[in-house]
A protein has these predicted regions:
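Alpha-helical lid/collar subdomain of P-loop NTPases
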Residues: 196-358
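General structural signal for secondary-structure boundaries
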Residues: 2, 6, 36, 171, ...
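Alpha-helix initiation/capping motif
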Residues: 98, 149, 171, 200, ...
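Terminal-proximal interaction/regulatory segments of ATP-powered molecular machines
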Residues: 301-501
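AAA+ P-loop NTPase catalytic core and its hallmark functional loops
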Residues: 1-212, 217-220
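Exposed alpha-helical structural elements
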Residues: 5, 9, 99, 103, ...
């Protein structure tokens, strides 16, 4: 299965294992709760999906890379204990609590949550001395004398032997006690993820145009060559950072992430071409309404004269800008909702604003440590606290530092904050109303419009906006394309009927 399907399998398993009856007992017997083993090539996102499930299901995640551990850190250190058996006194060996099990209990104490995910990466590459211990854990959910608490799902990950010489095979006894989930590198799943994650438009466009370039691992007599999903995503982040700083991107930089010369050179050429199209067409100016009639007419002629690659890139440039607008609206909307909820929580409590903000920051620290929320969510939450803190300082300067006066002051500031959200709504609506007519003028209702509507429909951010605020341009385009599809289907039925006669 692809990485997104594997993510849903983890989510569904977590929910099934944690389901409880009317008495609060787990419906799924603990002895039947098999650990999940994600087995797939490196860099496809196995670790990332486990982190995402933990955040989305609001459970703590304890993660360990097993190649960094010895038998002592997994099982615990030996200690001498005194025992009496059958009237005789003995000195016996016991073990301290496993570091891994200890981390699980710490997560439970720090978060106040009794259920979570224990993720063990590179599990089939452990040392020879640790291998029997790991097999015992997968079979019995115990390290030494200490068992994993109830309510914790074990997810392990590893690479097949062809990708790692250090791999150890599991025996049939272990395999019969786990759920082996093979994970494949999927270009389509990556594009879906990348569009929502805000990856660089050149990468999304290139991989949509050349899906065979998405993933590659090979070895020759000189070196190992590889191109992975992780490499594409990390390259995307650096490209965006370099562009924001005005730093030129060289071909050697691309090769640091795409370790296959043919692919790195080919993508670098496309990246430069994509950038030149972006500058030549002025997509940002078109969607922002800053282009005059002569400018639009010139770009229309340019697009109509372009080859398939140029047209494909133009549509993707427009989609990239639309995704930026949708993301900006989504951030503003989420900010306003979270800001309102945080302020309401403060109004309900009787303490000072300073104590409230300190408690919230402590809670954020716990969420950060156990990955209960994404880095972006935590950054946004910290930004909300800083904003309320700033408003609190302004309230003191206005002699409205506490009580009902402070509440009125904060509510007034919040009302002003909502205007920024309205600006993002107007921006997104206008961009859709300009993008669709522009491409229609350029290409009619051709394949370019189908590509545009597919990109919009496949974007959760844009569809969430349209579902909430509507878009006459989008709905009209959908109607036209659906009519064309129905007409084509009717013509095909007529043709078949004539052929039968």
């Amino acid at each position: 299965m692809n990485i997104q399907q594997a993510k849903e399998e983890i989510r569904n398993t977590l929910r099934a294992y944690l389901q409880k009856d009317g008495e609060g007992k787990y419906c799924f017997p603990t002895v039947r709760q098999r650990p999940l083993l994600l087995m797939g090539p490196p860099g496809v996102g196995k670790t990332a999906i486990v982190e995402q499930v933990a955040r989305e299901e609001q459970v703590p995640l304890v993660a360990y890379t097993m190649t960094h551990h010895t038998r002592q850190s997994a099982v615990g250190l030996p200690k001498i204990a005194e025992r009496d058996y059958c009237g005789r006194h003995f000195s016996v060996t016991e073990y301290t609590m496993s570091e891994i099990i200890g981390a699980v209990y710490e997560a439970m104490d720090r978060t106040g949550k009794r259920e979570g995910i224990l993720f063990l990466d590179e599990i089939n590459c452990v040392s020879e001395t640790l291998a029997p211990t790991m097999l015992q854990f997968l079979q019995n959910k115990t390290f030494g004398n200490h068992a994993l608490p109830e309510g914790w799902l074990i997810v392990a990950a590893g690479n097949p032997p062809e990708y790692n010489k250090s791999v150890r095979d599991f025996n049939i006894v272990t395999l019969d006690r786990i759920r082996n989930i093979p994970v494949e590198a999927s270009q389509q799943a990556f594009l879906t993820y990348g569009a929502e994650a805000g990856l660089h438009g050149a990468i999304l466009s290139y991989l949509a145009l050349k899906p065979e370039k998405f993933y590659h691992v090979s070895r020759d007599e000189n070196a190992l060559h590889y191109v992975t999903a992780r490499g594409w995503e990390d390259l995307s982040r650096l490209l965006q950072s370099y562009e924001s700083l005005g730093i030129p991107v060289e071909e050697a930089l691309v090769g640091e992430f795409l370790n296959l010369e043919e692919t790195s050179r080919d993508f670098y050429d496309y990246y430069r071409l994509y950038g030149s199209y972006g500058r030549d067409y002025g997509v940002r100016e078109i969607l922002a309404g800053e282009a005059d009639t002569a400018f639009l007419a010139d770009r229309k002629a340019m697009a109509q004269a372009g080859d398939f690659t140029e047209r494909f890139a133009l549509v993707n440039l427009i989609l990239e800008q639309l995704r930026r607008y949708a993301a900006a609206y989504g951030r503003e909307d989420a900010l306003d909702v979270a800001l309102h909820e945080t302020m309401q929580a403060f109004f309900r409590q009787n303490g000072s604003l300073e104590d409230f903000l300190a408690a919230r920051r402590n809670a954020l620290q716990t969420k950060r440590q156990f990955r209960l929320e994404s880095a972006d969510s935590l950054t946004a939450a910290e930004g909300i606290l800083r904003k309320i803190e700033q408003w609190g300082l302004e309230a003191k300067q206005a002699r409205c530092g506490d009580g009902a006066a402070l509440e009125r002051f904060l509510k007034a500031r919040f009302d002003g904050q909502l205007e920024s959200r309205q600006g993002k709504i107007r921006q997104m609506t206008a961009a859709l109303d300009r993008a669709i007519p522009f491409l229609t003028d350029c290409f009619g209702d051709g394949q370019e419009l189908t590509l545009l509507i597919t990109g919009i429909t496949g974007s959760k951010g844009m569809m969430a906006f349209i579902a909430r605020h509507g878009s006459d341009s989008y709905l009209a385009l959908c109607g036209r394309l659906q009519c064309q599809k129905n007409e084509a289907q009717l013509q095909e039925l007529c043709r078949r009927a004539v052929e039968k006669k």
